[in-house]
Amino acid sequence: VLLCSLVAATAAWPYFGGFQRDEPDGVPTAQKQHDINFLLHKLYEPLHEANLKALEDSFDPLAHTANMPDGGVAVNKLMQEVKTQHLEERHHWFSVFNATQREEALLLVKVLLQCQDWPTAIGNAVYFRKMMNEETYVYALYTAIKHSPLTKHVVLPPLYEIMPHFFTSSEVIQQAYRAKLIEKPGRFNMNFTGTQNNPEHKIAYFGEDIGLSTHYINWHIEYPFWWNETFGYQIERRGENYFWVHHQLVNRFEAERISNHLQKIEKLHWERNLHEGFDPHTSYKNGNPFPFRHDDIHIEDVDKVAEVRDMIVMENRIRDAIAHGYVIDKEGNKVDINNEHGIDILGDIIESCVYNPYNEYYGSLHNMGHMMLGHQGDPHAKYYDTPSVLEHYETALRDPAFYKLHKYIDDLFRKHKDHLKPYSQEDLLFPGVAVNMIDIDGPLETYFEDYEYSLMNAMDDKEEMIWEDSMEISAIIPRLRHKDFSFKVNIMNNNDENKLSTIRIFAWPHRDVNGVIMPFNEGRWHAIELDKFQKELIPGENTITRKSSESSVTVPDVPSLKSLHEQTEAAIAGSSELNLDEFVSATGLPNRLLIPKGNEAGVEFKLVVAVTDGVADSVNDEINLTTKFHHYGHHGVYLDKKPHGYPLDRRVPDERLFHEIPNFGETIVKVFNRDEHVYHH
């Protein structure tokens, strides 16, 4: 019976061989991408694809557990939830910060990661699509696709097209509904939240950038705080990665503020007023609005979440650990953090993730902080029961309170880093290597350009509708971009042999918003990472040119769902190969946002290039063969032995030491924005 079921499941969708096969099951990537595209197309409606609909009707999850490593434990648990009707209802909201809803999502993640072949994986994905809350399902499916070896070449469609309500103003959604009602295609311009009367409106282009929000949720999908080894492998240096991604967001936000003549972020204080309010102007798919928050509110206890004093207690315990140089684990042992690995432990504690050595004692400062601030508009749930934008990774970056919270957390990390011994000259030297010259080829200039994305998934359609019949309804929003440029670095290798080098490029605002030059030790903490890559240096002079588009810090825009569909169907039809590998990793920043906006007068930045020993830096020899030295790592493995931000991550008591290191170089550059806007009509 089991064999017959497997054959039936496999026969329910066509098999196309010959191109871009995945390991270990040999099913073409094009087939997998096709299936995922249709699972997410019209997410809130029944499946529209005939083969998947047939599979939905015939697949029995309990009949396909023989090859699962856990013997079907995860499937049985999820099926029991289905049978007892304990799953979250459809058309309801979902937040990963809600423990009950999160556990439900993890049941599906476990089921999908237990699948050892594509027929079983897609069968389960199809079956549970109709059983689960739509947003829970998307979170679980995206996470499983990111971590399963079966889907290593599958591209996750952009979430702003899968769940447009999270990224699109209610006003535009209403315009789209009206266009759909009268069956007239439409393209609708969307404005950023707030008005000119709100100073924060000047930088809404950054926090509300849909690509930046996609980066943020993709990072959290790649490095979920709930992850442990039972899901397949351990994620290395997860806590340090958590520190770095948020440190960079804060630093980039600060650089954008300087570009717009705004004062620096004031960090959060639990016992002071929260000055910045926020009205997101967005609604859930079921019509419930995202809660708003007034200006100048006193931070209150939040019912069923936490009290303000709880947050202060957590903070003080973390401060004590930093001051003493150790944390306490569950057995009462002292775990030293005054070393290069301490940042990893501290990050695990602050978030807090499963690797937290003593969660019951240190609590969850970050996650609880998001929930506390998110409920300040209605702390006693008198008017809302829906989560705020701060309780969704897709929307959190839009709220100014996000940056106040993370400035406050970043200050804790800095206190820890400042406790560490500064780097010595020996720590920093790359013997025989010197940076002679740093230059920029091309303009450091930014501009805004209109971007269009589909609202198709926000609209309801008839069940018999086919993809090609979908009406073109879309939103248009301006996005920051920069003109192409290249870094040019002249490096002298005075050794008699080739040397593998790691080239690390950073920049920080040369002056604060008041025009005062930042001291070196202050500037280096505000540095934004622009690139990190490896290069073989021949003996003698080496002139290295690195295009801005090649930066390992950034990734290109993922193709639209329509484009993914068209490319996939063309590959299946045999007219072209499906080659989407450049879009598989979506954890980097959008390549449009590599440099800050700047302004018409030009914003000065100190550009620092550090050339370090590539052999000593690399985790293994395989990295030497890669062209993408990605700083977030891959599949739980971080590829660089050095700490994030090295060599700028530790305090510099005397900047003269830094200037005397021959393998480091620096210069001053200016970034311009001349109010250029490229419109698409």
UniProtKB/Swiss-Prot annotation:
Keyword Oxidoreductase: no
Tissues expressing the protein: Strongly expressed in ovaries. Also expressed in heart. Not detected in hepatopancreas, gills, connective tissue or muscle.
PROSITE patterns named in the record: HEMOCYANIN_2 (PS00210), TYROSINASE_2 (PS00498)
Any GO MF annotation of the entry: oxidoreductase activity
Positions of glycan attachment: 98, 191, 228, 624
Disulfide bonds: none
NADP keyword on record: no
One protein family per Pfam: Hemocyanin_N
Entry-linked InterPro entries: Di-copper_centre_dom_sf, Hemocyanin/hexamerin, Hemocyanin/hexamerin_mid_dom, Hemocyanin_C, Hemocyanin_C_sf, Hemocyanin_N, Hemocyanin_N_sf, Ig_E-set
Keywords on record: Glycoprotein, Signal
Coiled coil: none
Cleavable signal peptide: 1-21
Subunit structure and binding partners: Hexamer.
UniProt record similarity statement: Belongs to the tyrosinase family. Hemocyanin subfamily.
Summary of the function given for this chain in its UniProt record: Does not function as a hemocyanin.
PANTHER family found in the cross-reference section: FAT-BODY PROTEIN 1-RELATED, LARVAL STORAGE PROTEIN/PHENOLOXIDASE
Note: Does not bind copper.
Protein name: Pseudohemocyanin-2
